[in-house]
Amino acid sequence: MDCYRKYAAVTLTILSVFLHLLHTFPDGEFLMQGCPECKLGENRFFSKPGAPIYQCTGCCFSRAYPTPMRSKKTMLVPKNITSEATCCVAKAFTKITLKDNVKIENHTDCHCSTCYYHKS
């Protein structure tokens, strides 16, 4: 009998931990592998009820290809592979002025395009 109680306690503990993890990550973020696709997402910081503000969020895939020989000759440290990164950016937007003359862009369409700002 004591053996069954231990198994039941362990099973309930594992189930509680699993349910806790499931509720910790809202909107299915826990189940999502990698990064979501590039799309519009509501910016909860600037949005007001009835006046949502959207921004582009998500990931775009980078591509890699062999470095052309003429480019390799000009490199200080020659690389065999060249990569080209793309970022999720606004394809179209409208400018909005909030309180205190704060101007922001409300994105209306997103796409993957060349990254202009890179982290160092």
Curated annotation (Swiss-Prot):
Concerning PROSITE patterns, the annotation shows: GLYCO_HORMONE_ALPHA_1, GLYCO_HORMONE_ALPHA_2, GLYCO_HORMONE_ALPHA_3
> Is Signal there in the keyword field?
yes
Q: Which InterPro entries match?
A: Cystine-knot_cytokine (IPR029034), Glyco_hormone (IPR000476)
Keyword Protein transport set for record: no
Which Gene Ontology BP annotations are present?
Answer: cellular response to hormone stimulus; follicle-stimulating hormone secretion; G protein-coupled receptor signaling pathway; gonad development; luteinizing hormone secretion; negative regulation of organ growth; organ growth; positive regulation of steroid biosynthetic process
Keyword annotations from UniProtKB, A to Z: Disulfide bond, Glycoprotein, Hormone, Secreted, Signal
Compartments in which it is found: Secreted
Signal peptide positions on this chain: 1-24
Q: What is its main location?
A: secreted
GO molecular function ontology, one term from the record: follicle-stimulating hormone activity
SMART domains of this UniProt entry?
GHA
This protein's source sits in the domain of life called: Eukaryota
What Gene Ontology terms describe where this protein resides (cellular component)? extracellular space; follicle-stimulating hormone complex
Q: Which residues have a glycan attached per UniProt?
A: 80, 106
Its family remark reads:
Belongs to the glycoprotein hormones subunit alpha family.
Per UniProt, subunit arrangement is: Heterodimer. Glycoprotein hormones are heterodimers composed of a common alpha chain described here and a unique beta chain which confers their biological specificity to the different hormones.
Q: What does this protein do?
A: Shared alpha chain of heterodimeric glycoprotein hormones. These hormones bind specific receptors on target cells that in turn activate downstream signaling pathways.
Q: What is this protein called?
A: Glycoprotein hormones alpha chain
Which organism was this protein described from? Meleagris gallopavo (Wild turkey)
